[in-house]
Amino acid sequence: MVSIRAPIIARCCAPAPQEISHRTMKKTLMIAFTLAAGTLTPALAQDAKAGADKVAMCVGCHGIPGYQASFPEIHKVPMIAGQGAKYIVSALTAYRRGERKHPTMRSIAGSMSDQDMADVAAYYEVQGKAAAAGAAPTPAPAVAELLKKGACASCHGENLSKPIDPSYPKLAGQHADYLFVALKAYQTDKNPHVGRSNPVMMGMARPFTQVELKALSAYIASMPGDLRTVSQARFR
């Protein structure tokens, strides 16, 4: 889901995560961006054409429609075609650093140079759907409350498909079981084998029950979006 590498903002006297309003969340994120600005390194030039020659390690899973992974539980691998390039680089970097715990992805990310990541990310960014079809379905009242509770649109943008920062993922249309597993991972802390380390997403995910996360994931998966699976046959 979201990858933010800004310094952790002091939480003294801060409201509980479930009480954070959309306005407060946006203000918090803007402060984080400002604090981090001095530590950011220049982005590498991205070459989508070069990336097309580097995706062999990706298509074995992400190029097969409906392909399932088994770690940490069975779920469809995420659709990455159409995802933002900066987010893809951010996610790969998190796997390489161990901030996202996944043995296969850490091995793959560890074998990639920064330039490889930039090129592969650029390639997948331009492989999304030409246009999202139709409007998002109206959520059930209970789901609408969950979306409000999580302040999802505050970061992931309109229809959860236009993130306010390119390092955040597009969510609309993503596989429900993947979203559920990813959200649960943010509830897992200080485990050397599973989980994801991200201060903002950890704070947002923890107040939800698994039943609520499943309902939220199912609705987000039903939303039209840019993401898709580019068939492996495309690369032969």
Feature-to-residue mapping (PLM):
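Bacterial N-terminal signal peptides that target proteins for export
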Residues: R23-I31
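C-terminal capping alpha-helices of c-type cytochrome domains
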Residues: G110-A132, D177, M204-Q232
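Sequence/structural segment immediately N-terminal to covalent heme-attachment motifs in c-type
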Residues: Q46-Q68, A135-L160, H175, A233-R236
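Sec/Tat signal peptide C-region and signal peptidase I cleavage site
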Residues: L40-A45
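Short, Lys/Arg-enriched N-terminal segments with co-localized hydrophobic residues
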Residues: I8-T24
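His/Met- and acidic-residue-enriched segments that coordinate or traffic transition-metal cofactors
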Residues: D53-V59, G63-Q68, Q83-Y87, A94-R97, ...
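Gly/Gly-Pro-rich "capping" loops immediately C-terminal to redox-active cysteine motifs
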Residues: P65-R96, R106-S111, E145, A153, ...
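Bacterial N-terminal signal peptides
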Residues: A32-T39
